[in-house]
């Protein structure tokens, strides 16, 4: 988490870059998110997730961040990936006549996802609770099959850009074709903050 602290310090925070996520780091993160949301004239989250994309590279790693909000308070931040893993970057699908892996654009969509869970996780998609896309969002479809994100082909719709577990490895691999994915050891604690059917917004900031 040192990288996040370095990013926040570059934006004006004064954090010790020790990789420890305490109240000062969460406060600084909330300050940054709130400023960006206000500048964009978006809605500040009450209960939900805010994704922070740190670069425009398909790194196949969890090098982005997800801030968790509960009751309007930023209660946690965890690593995530907001871009597809190598499987889909180098073997992209074709959708609506355009070949390319899906890359969610910076945006906020109100009520975009709902939480899906039950007592028997084995019956759930990917064997775990997840957030399912239920409203259209904007994506780029990148078909250049390299590690650089291109913003050429834009689409708007329901593409199954869900939010879910990202496995136990250090790489994204086949876990994401454009979904927001969070490593299992961070994902499962996050799910305790939500109930089945709960609706959240999709908020993605590029920093």
Task: Give the residues covered by each predicted segment.
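Short acidic, glycine/serine/threonine-rich helix-capping segments at coil-helix boundaries
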Residues: 1-32
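Short, well-ordered, aromatic-rich surface patches in folded extracellular/luminal domains
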Residues: 182
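Cell wall/extracellular polymer interaction/catalysis modules
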Residues: 21-173, 187-200, 205-207
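Active-site neighborhood of thiol-dependent amide/isopeptide-bond enzymes
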Residues: 176
């Amino acid at each position: 988490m040192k990288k996040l602290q370095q990013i926040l310090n570059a934006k004006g925070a004064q954090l010790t870059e020790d990789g420890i996520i305490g109240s000062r780091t969460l406060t600084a993160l909330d300050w940054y998110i709130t400023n960006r949301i206000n500048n964009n004239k978006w809605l500040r989250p009450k209960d939900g997730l805010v994704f922070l994309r740190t670069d425009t590279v398909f790194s196949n790693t969890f090098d982005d961040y997800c801030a968790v909000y509960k009751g309007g308070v930023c209660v946690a931040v965890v690593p995530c990936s907001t871009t597809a893993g190598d499987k889909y970057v180098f073997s992209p699908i074709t959708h609506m006549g355009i070949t390319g892996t899906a890359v969610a654009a910076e945006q906020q969509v109100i009520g975009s996802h709902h939480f899906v869970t039950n007592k028997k996780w084995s019956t759930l998609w990917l064997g775990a609770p997840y957030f399912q896309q239920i409203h259209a969002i904007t994506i780029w479809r990148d078909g250049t099959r390299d590690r650089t994100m291109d913003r050429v082909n834009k689409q708007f719709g329901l593409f199954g850009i869900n939010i879910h577990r990202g496995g136990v490895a250090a790489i994204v691999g086949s876990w994401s074709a454009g979904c927001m994915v969070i490593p299992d050891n961070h994902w499962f604690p996050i799910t305790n903050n939500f109930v089945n059917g709960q609706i959240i917004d999709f908020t993605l900031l590029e920093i």
